Amino acid sequence: MNLLTQYLKPYIGRISLGVSIKFFGSLMDLLLPWILAYIIDSVIPTKQVSAIFAWGGAMVVCSIIAVVTNIIANRMASSVARDTTGSIRHDLFEKVSYLSIPQVEEVGIPSLVSRLTTDTYNIHQTVGMIQRMGIRAPILLLGGIMITATLDPVLTLVLVGVLPFTLVAAVTISKRGIPLFASLQKQVDVLVRTVRENVTGARVIKALSKADYEKKRFDHVKQDVVAAETTANRTMAATPPLMDLFLNIGLTLVIVVSAFRVNQGLTQPGVIIAFLTYFTIILNAMLSITRIFVIVSKGLASADRIQSVLRLPQNMQVIEAPVKEESAHIVFEKVSFTYPNGTRVLKDIDFSLQPGETLGIIGATGSGKSTIVKLLLRLYDPTKGMIRIAGRDIRSIVPTELHQLFGVVLQKDVLFAETIEENIAFGRRFSKEQIEEAAARAQAKEFINQLPKRLAHPLHTKGSNLSGGQKQRVLLSRALAGDPEILILDDSASALDYRTDAQLRKVLRQQFQQTTTVLIAQRISSIQHADKILVLENGQMNGFGSHQKLLAENAIYQAIYQGQTGGADDAEEKNGKTKG
C-alpha cells in the first residue's frame, strides 16, 4: 500500500476533483428513488398533472447529471490510473536497468518481466477500480442506508442487521486471498521463464526434436499456474455468493416486514417501492465492494512484488580509494571470485598489462575466461583481491565512467530489433562516416553494402535475419565505433572464417596500437600474436607469457596447439631451430 500511496500523491488534486464529481453524481443516483416515492405518495394523490411532470422532469435531470458526472469521473480515474502505472513502470524499468548482475540473477529475469507487465497491469486495474467503484460504492451504500433511515427506521434496522455479516465475510475471505494471489504471481514467473526458454531456444528444440518434451514441460508448468489460480479464485469466488445469501435474506425480511407495516398503516406504498429500490442500490454497492476486494487483493500482492524490487539496495557502491602510481594499464592483483551460490570460479589471478598491450586468454570450457571479463567490467566484484585500471581501483570509478572506457563484444551478446546503424551506434552520437569506418574495420562493410537498405537494414530480434558471422561483425563494429581505451573481445570471432579473422586481427594490430585489448578465444590462431597469453585451468593461472614461451613450457597450451594444428607447425618450428 505504501507504493500506491507514494505514486498517487502527485495526482491528489486530480483524484480529489474526480472524487468530488463522483460524489455529486452518486448523490443524484440516490435522489431518484426518493423523488419516486414522493411522486407516488404525495404528488399523484393531488392529481396535479403539472406537478407530476415537474417532478418527473426533476428525475430526468438527476439521471442526466448522474450519467454525465460518472462519465467525467471515470475518465479522470482512467487518466490517473494510466499516469500512476506509467510512473511505476518507468521507475521499475529504470531500477531494473541499474540492478547489478547478482541482483538480476537473484530476482530472476522471468520474474522481472512479470513484474513489469502483469504486476503493473494489476496495479492499473486497482487504481482505476478504487477511483471508479471504490468511491461510488461506499457512497451508495452509506447514502442509501441514511436515506432509508429517514423513510422508515424500522425497515432500515432490518437492513443494517444483515450488513455486518456481509462485511465480515468479505474481509475474512480477502485476507486469505492476498497471499494466494502472491503465490499465483510466482507461478506466473515460472510460466514466463518457460515460455522465454522455449522461444529463445526454438532452434535447438527443433534441431533435437524436443518439441514434444518441451510441450509436456510447458503443460506441467501451466497446470501449476492453473492450480494456483484455481485456489485463489475459488477462495475469492465464495465472496459474491455469500453476499447474495445475506442480502437476499435481508431482502426477504424487508418484504415481510414491509407487508406487515403497510397493512397496519404504518408506512406508505411509495416508501416501500423506494425502500426496495434503495435496497437494490445497496445490494449492488455491496457486490461492487466485493469485486473491489478481489481486484485490490491482486493489486496489493503485485504492489508488494514491485516494491521489493524498487527497495533493492545499490550493492555495487562506488568507494573511495587512493590512486596508485604505476605504469600498468590493467592490473589483476590476487583476484579470486566465488558466485553467491558458493561456486568458486577464479583463484589468485595475478597479471598486469601495459597500455596498448594485447592479452589473449585461453582455457577449457568453464575455466573462468568470461568471468575475468565480467570482473573487469565490474558486473561482479571480486571476492578477494583488487582490479585496477590506470592505477585506480575499479570500485572507485563511477560505473558510467568505467564503462565508457570499454568496447565490448561478449560471448552471448545481443543485437536489437533496430537498424544496423542503430545497433552500431547504440545510443551514442556518431556520424554516418564514423559508423561506416567502424563497419569497415570490423570487416562488415562488404556484406552490409550488399543489403537492400545497407546501414538502414532492419534487424530482427537478436539479429536472427543475419548469419552467425554477420552478427559477430556487426557486434565488432559496435565495439570498435567508439575508439575505446580498452577493447574486450570474448570469443567474438568464433563464427568468422579464417580469412576474415586474419584481416580483423591485422586491423586490430595496425589501427588500435594504443588500445589495450583482451581477447578470449577457442582458437590459438586468434591469440598467438598477443603480447601475453593467459592459460586458465579450473579457475587458476596455469601459464602466462608469449606464444613461443607457452609453446615451449606449458603442457596445456602445447596440447591445445597440437590438437588444433596436428603438431605440424610445431614440428616445422623445431626443425627450423635444429637447422639453425
Residues covered by each model-derived region:
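Short intracellular "coupling" helices and adjacent cytoplasmic loop segments at the cytosolic face
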Residues: 46, 82, 90-114, 118-120, ...
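ABC-type nucleotide-binding domain
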Residues: 325-580
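Hydrophobic alpha-helical transmembrane bundles that constitute the permease/transmembrane domains
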Residues: 23-31, 64-71, 123-126, 130-142, ...
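An intracellular "coupling" helix at the cytosolic face of ABC transporter transmembrane type-1 domains
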Residues: 10-12, 77, 101-102, 118-127, ...
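Membrane-integrated ABC transporters
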Residues: 1-29, 36, 44-60, 69, ...
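Helix-loop-helix
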Residues: 47-51, 147-161, 231-304, 309-310
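Transmembrane helices of ABC transporter permease
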Residues: 10, 14-27, 62-68, 129-184, ...
